[in-house]
């Protein structure tokens, strides 16, 4: 008898029918690179990009199943850049992480010409051979840009890789593709979007943003900032997260570039969680070529530095939030805000603990206002100062996205009579904010202090398990 089984595509994956064993494999096969309708709104139709940067994406076929989509990206500057990066704290640091660290240390953050990225294979836990592969990628880009070094330890290109851990790169494919990508370098929006696509793995949409701004010393001069990032799973950062490349045409001294990036990352990429895992490859790099001219930012005490710090941090937060919105199988974007803590660090630890809790995440997926799970996570938060969490002073509420009054769940340790119908309506929305107050709640007593910590995270769904169960296929 002819099968009447039906298939449907959701979020770029094909939904499979029940197997003969009665099990359901929800989203097991990548359908194509089409972008889900719900994600289209996050993709820019145009952009204003920093002067002097050229980008491209090209197809190498790093994964054999990828027969046509770009999986190698180049981001190059026409002139040498100042550069800084933050890297994963995972002990098994991937080969590209080690090579990029070496490039920055050898050059002391100067003379950097660009970044080469491949998706489909992480080149992590691949031994000496993997290290040589990463070095060859860097050297190949230098060769294409006309800046080859006689010393293989002194290349000028950073390297990033993302994909399956424990497998060697098909290095010949990548080295053969780098010249093709170089020949396609361009500065237009299409080129930036193609490069952003090339670094994706299980992402359902490319993550790209750009901004134009001014600085106090040059109020009539336009500066630009652009960034791309990738990530949808294995995301819970520690010193960095995912892959991110930020480029600006502001002239910035290498000595202040690192504190600029570290501050921005600590309040953005280090404040998101999808599944609690910290990758072996996490890298966020910032390149500044000074092509827009004006005064060079050389000290952390200058008005330009202060302004740039705010601009970069806000920009990085917007990029990081796109990663959460593309969490594997996610249906919710959740902000957790912990207020009135004695320190920012303790507030962030508590927010992070809530964001990592599988019970909190699954309750939100089920649209269940089970605030006891939030309290439980607050209570077992590790490494915070004694007396930070006092049950009798703790309040929890849901803050709706429509601007209406917060739904109070717990006030000063006392449970509220929760309007379950209103709670259900709030949890129907894609966006939600959880507010935890460690001070005096509605009594207005600030109690322990006024520091705040924020984390962004998503829920856990059936699809997350299936996507990751089938990752290597």
UniProtKB/Swiss-Prot annotation:
GO cellular component labels: mitochondrial matrix
Give the chief site where it resides: mitochondrion
Could you say which EC number(s) this protein's record lists? 2.3.1.35, 2.3.1.1
In chain numbering, where does the site feature Cleavage fall? 240-241
Q: Where is substrate annotated to bind?
A: 201, 230, 241, 328, 468, 473
Instruction: Describe its assembly.
Output: Heterodimer of an alpha and a beta chain.
Family per record: Belongs to the ArgJ family.
Q: What else is known?
A: This protein may be expected to contain an N-terminal transit peptide but none has been predicted.
Task: Please give the name of this protein.
Answer: Arginine biosynthesis bifunctional protein ArgJ, mitochondrial
């Amino acid at each position: 008898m002819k099968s009447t089984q039906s298939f449907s595509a959701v979020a770029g994956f094909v939904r499979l029918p029940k197997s003969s064993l009665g099990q359901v494999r929800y989203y097991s096969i990548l359908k194509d690179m089409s972008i889900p309708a719900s994600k289209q709104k996050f993709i820019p139709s145009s952009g204003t990009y920093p002067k002097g940067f050229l980008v491209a994406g090209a197809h190498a076929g790093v994964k054999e199943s990828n027969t046509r989509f770009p999986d190698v990206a180049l981001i190059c500057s026409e002139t040498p850049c100042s550069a800084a990066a933050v890297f994963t704290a995972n002990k098994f640091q991937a080969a590209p992480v080690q090579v990029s660290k070496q490039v920055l240390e050898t050059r002391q953050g100067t003379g950097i010409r660009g970044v080469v990225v491949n998706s489909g294979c992480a080149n992590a836990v691949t031994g000496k051979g993997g290290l040589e592969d990463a070095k060859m990628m860097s050297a190949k880009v230098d060769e294409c840009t006309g800046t080859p070094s006689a010393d293989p330890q002194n290349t000028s290109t950073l390297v990033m890789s993302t994909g399956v851990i424990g497998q060697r790169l098909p290095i010949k494919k990548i080295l053969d593709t780098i010249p093709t990508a170089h020949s396609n370098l361009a500065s237009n929006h299409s080129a930036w979007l193609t490069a952003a696509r090339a670094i994706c793995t299980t992402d359902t949409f490319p993550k790209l943003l750009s901004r134009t701004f001014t600085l106090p010393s040059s109020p009539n001069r336009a500066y630009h900032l652009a960034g791309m990032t990738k990530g949808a799973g294995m995301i819970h950062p520690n010193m960095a997260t995912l892959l991110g490349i930020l480029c600006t045409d502001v002239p910035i001294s290498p000595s202040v570039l690192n504190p600029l990036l570290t501050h921005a990352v600590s309040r953005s990429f280090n404040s998101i969680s999808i599944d609690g895992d910290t990758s072996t490859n996490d890298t966020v790099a910032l390149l500044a070529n000074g092509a827009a001219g004006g005064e060079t930012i050389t000290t952390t005490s200058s008005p330009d530095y202060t302004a740039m710090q705010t601009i970069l941090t806000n920009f990085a937060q917007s990029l990081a939030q796109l990663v959460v919105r593309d969490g594997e199988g996610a249906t919710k974007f959740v902000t957790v805000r912990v207020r009135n803590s004695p320190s920012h660090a303790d507030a962030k630890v508590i927010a992070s603990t809530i964001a990592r809790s599988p019970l909190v995440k699954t309750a939100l997926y089920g649209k269940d206002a089970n605030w006891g799970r939030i309290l439980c996570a607050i209570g077992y938060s590790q490494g915070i100062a004694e007396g930070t969490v006092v049950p009798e002073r703790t309040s929890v509420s849901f803050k709706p996205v429509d601007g209406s009054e917060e739904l109070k769940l717990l006030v000063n340790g006392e449970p509220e009579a929760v309007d379950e119908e209103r709670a259900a309506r709030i949890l129907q929305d894609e966006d939600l904010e959880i507010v935890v107050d460690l001070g005096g709640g509605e009594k207005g007593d600030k109690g322990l202090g006024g520091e705040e910590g924020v984390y962004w995270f998503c829920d856990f769904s059936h699809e997350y398990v299936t996507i990751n169960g089938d990752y290597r296929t």
